From Swiss-Prot:
<keyword id="KW-0963">Cytoplasm</keyword>
<keyword id="KW-0949">S-adenosyl-L-methionine</keyword>
<feature type="binding site">
    <location>
        <position position="149"/>
    </location>
    <ligand>
        <name>[4Fe-4S] cluster 2</name>
    </ligand>
</feature>
<dbReference type="InterPro" id="IPR006467">
    <property type="entry name" value="MiaB-like_bact"/>
</dbReference>
<protein>
    <recommendedName>
        <fullName>Threonylcarbamoyladenosine tRNA methylthiotransferase MtaB</fullName>
        <ecNumber>2.8.4.5</ecNumber>
    </recommendedName>
</protein>
<dbReference type="InterPro" id="IPR006638">
    <property type="entry name" value="Elp3/MiaA/NifB-like_rSAM"/>
</dbReference>
<feature type="binding site">
    <location>
        <position position="145"/>
    </location>
    <ligand>
        <name>[4Fe-4S] cluster 2</name>
    </ligand>
</feature>
<feature type="binding site">
    <location>
        <position position="85"/>
    </location>
    <ligand>
        <name>[4Fe-4S] cluster 1</name>
    </ligand>
</feature>
<keyword id="KW-0004">4Fe-4S</keyword>
<dbReference type="InterPro" id="IPR038135">
    <property type="entry name" value="Methylthiotransferase_N_sf"/>
</dbReference>
<dbReference type="Pfam" id="PF04055">
    <property type="entry name" value="Radical_SAM"/>
</dbReference>
<comment type="function">
    <text>Catalyzes the methylthiolation of N6-threonylcarbamoyladenosine (t(6)A), leading to the formation of 2-methylthio-N6-threonylcarbamoyladenosine (ms(2)t(6)A) at position 37 in tRNAs that read codons beginning with adenine.</text>
</comment>
<dbReference type="GO" id="GO:0051539">
    <property type="term" value="F:4 iron, 4 sulfur cluster binding"/>
</dbReference>
<dbReference type="GO" id="GO:0061712">
    <property type="term" value="F:tRNA (N(6)-L-threonylcarbamoyladenosine(37)-C(2))-methylthiotransferase"/>
</dbReference>
<dbReference type="Pfam" id="PF00919">
    <property type="entry name" value="UPF0004"/>
</dbReference>
<dbReference type="InterPro" id="IPR005839">
    <property type="entry name" value="Methylthiotransferase"/>
</dbReference>
<feature type="domain" description="MTTase N-terminal">
    <location>
        <begin position="8"/>
        <end position="121"/>
    </location>
</feature>
Length: 421
């Protein structure tokens, strides 16, 4: 990537999903090519500040408002640009600020840099060349969602599903692999919706698998109803796809899944798990769960706990239900008291932790390839193909973004501990 002389300074703030992370990296690369220099010290003001926000929950909105205020305070003369879902969901907040911010809609995210500069020039393409501070590269393949789950505000903020051209995606992945990235994560708001003409997500993965130099392919997250026969075959048969999936659950109760407007049942979810494990009995899963959805009974909650144990997730991301205006669930009866949600979430976290550690115990004595993501002092940390977090003492020199063979010796609070072999 060609860099011009320094014309000014910029700061980037990213909140939320992996798609947002991809977009912020694209802004970083565009600005660098244009000759702007990134400021990483929060105490040093910049000329331009861009914040990519999230509004998936009320808590995410609150974090976004705080981050915007902080940017305004720390960068008193900067041009503040806000994009992402908070800009779509809470325009009143920005109208109430003493400081004027430029709002760029989600639909115009890819043209953000063009919109904020008035001078006439050829702007760099909205794509990534690397992924700052990451050992894996997130590649956005799709945006928007057509599912309209009853709790989710995202379709109203990001719009309908739109897929990127496969050729652009493949070229972008080849570029980051050439830069030395071993692992790419196929990311989107609803990745299972991906479709470029006759090219499905399955065919895209098969083509990514053929890119010279790629070592690992993951899908950021996917719903069980999107796992078609073709996609299952692509994931389990491709040479570089990892034997793990973030398979979204949300609830283990059929009645709650129906009220959520999810497109699968408890049985469908378990069938999907078993199908993957037929190809690899050790196939690993992580998931998301919403705790305290309106009407969630004690039995519904027990159903969720039981499926966590039955599947043996290595990690569960749990979220308290957050009532979002414009969604169907916002008006549902039988809202669960906050204290009950808090207690259930705490208990679910304890169960999930125990289950995850039990699953990792099964790996002890094995040797696995770890992609190094961080080296702190004499300890390196990364993930196995099964997405288990692995730490090990450094022997000699171990570089970030390299694959290292590690024998797994024990399980501790944060994951597996091993030794280089």
């Amino acid at each position: 990537m060609t860099v011009a002389e320094v014309k000014g300074t910029f700061k980037l703030v990213c909140l939320g999903c992996r798609v947002n992370q991809y977009e912020v990296q694209a802004y970083r690369d565009q600005l660098t090519i244009l000759g702007y220099q990134e400021v990483l010290d929060s105490e040093i003001p910049a000329d331009l500040c861009i914040i990519n926000t999230c509004a998936v929950t009320a808590s995410a909105e609150s974090s976004g408002r705080h981050a915007v205020r902080q940017l305004c305070r720390q960068n008193p003369t900067a041009h503040i640009v806000v994009t992402g879902c908070l800009g779509e969901s809470d325009k009143e907040f920005f109208a109430s600020l003493d400081r004027q911010c430029t709002l760029v809609s989600n639909k115009e995210k890819s043209r953000l840099i063009e919109k904020i500069f008035s001078y006439d020039t050829t702007f760099p393409e909205f794509k990534i060349h690397s992924f700052e501070g990451k050992s894996r590269a997130f590649i956005k393949v799709q945006d928007g969602c057509n599912s309209f789950c009853s709790y989710c505000i995202i379709p109203y903020l990001r719009g309908r599903s739109v897929s990127r051209p496969a050729e652009k995606i493949l070229a972008e992945i080849a570029g980051v692999v050439d830069q030395g990235y071993r692992e790419v994560v196929i990311a989107g708001i609803n990745v299972g919706d991906y479709c470029d003409g006759e090219r499905s997500l399955a065919s895209l993965i098969e083509q990514v698998d053929q890119i010279p130099g790629i070592e690992r392919i993951r899908i950021s997250s996917i719903d069980p109803d999107d796992i078609t026969e073709d996609l299952h075959r692509a994931i389990t048969s491709s040479r570089h796809t990892c034997p793990s999936s973030h398979l979204v659950l949300q609830s283990g109760s059929n009645s709650i899944l129906k009220r959520m407007n999810r497109k699968y049942s408890r049985g469908d979810f378990l069938d999907c798990v078993e199908k993957f494990r037929a190809s690899d009995p050790r196939y690993a899963f992580t998931t998301d769960v919403i705790v305290g959805f309106p009407g969630e009974s004690d039995q519904d909650f027990e159903d969720t706990l039981r499926i966590i144990e039955d599947v043996g997730f290595i990690k569960v991301h749990s979220f308290p239900f957050s009532a979002r205006r414009r969604t169907k669930a916002y008006t549902f009866d039988n809202q669960i008291p906050n204290q009950v949600i808090y207690e259930r979430k705490k208990y679910l976290a304890e169960v999930a932790k125990r289950v995850g550690q039990k699953e990792m115990m099964k790996r002890l004595g094995e040797t696995t390839e770890v992609l190094v993501e961080k080296v702190t002092g004499q300890v390196a940390t990364g993930h196995s193909p099964y997405f288990e977090k692995v730490s090990f003492p450094v022997v000699g020199t171990v570089a970030i973004n390299t694959l290292v063979s590690v024998r797994l010796d024990r399980v501790e609070e944060e994951g597996l501990i091993g030794e280089i072999v």
